[in-house]
């Protein structure tokens, strides 16, 4: 009879660390943000490293002995098109197979304010488990609500709050008006340019 075998776990040592590498520690998935090998004058060498929890986005500073072993995981990013939400789930379409998958809002969190229908998003997987959704780095949106600009407003003249079509509120230059299209950096939530 056929018996399922567990795949061998890929382990790496601290000597193999690279920024962006995926790790599984105590059942949670992380990516290495930065690391530093330290060789003090006395005592053994150690490694200081910063990892980011791929589910909640928190970063954690850690220290371990040089040569410590960790479970390495392959992080896979799939491009999917955001279609719509029905209130309970967000629906994405695989751009290669056209399969639609529902995603719980717990995977999206604060990033919901950058989701715009038909935009291509990055869905991050490890061990075939969805870890999170990243909107495009830049989105092109319309300003749906803001105070009107007035003659004499310049690029140097400060900013004002504006609501964009996704529902997010961002700071925009004083000269922009409702109905204008702009480009926004979703990583910082800042205005980039008028379109």
Predicted regions and their residues:
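Short, Lys/Arg-enriched N-terminal segments with co-localized hydrophobic residues
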Residues: 1-8
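Acidic-enriched and Gly/Ser
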Residues: 8-165, 169-195
């Amino acid at each position: 009879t056929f018996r399922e075998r567990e795949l061998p776990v890929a382990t790496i040592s601290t000597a193999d660390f690279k920024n962006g590498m995926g790790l599984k520690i105590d059942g949670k998935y992380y990516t290495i943000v930065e690391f530093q090998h330290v060789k003090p004058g006395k005592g053994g060498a150690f490694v200081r490293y910063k990892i980011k929890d791929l589910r909640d986005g928190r970063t954690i500073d850690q220290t371990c002995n040089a040569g410590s072993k960790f479970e390495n995981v392959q992080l896979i990013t799939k491009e999917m098109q955001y279609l719509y939400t029905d209130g309970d789930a967000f629906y994405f379409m695989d751009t290669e197979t056209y399969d639609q998958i529902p995603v719980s809002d717990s995977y999206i969190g604060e990033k919901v304010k950058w989701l715009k229908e038909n935009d291509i998003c990055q869905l991050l997987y490890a061990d075939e488990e969805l870890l999170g959704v990243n909107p495009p780095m830049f989105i092109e949106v319309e300003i749906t609500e803001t105070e009107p600009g007035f003659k004499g407003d310049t690029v140097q003249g400060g900013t004002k709050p504006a609501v964009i079509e996704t529902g997010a509120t961002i700071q925009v230059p004083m000269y922009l008006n409702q109905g204008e299209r702009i480009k926004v950096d979703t990583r910082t939530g800042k205005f980039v340019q008028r379109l």
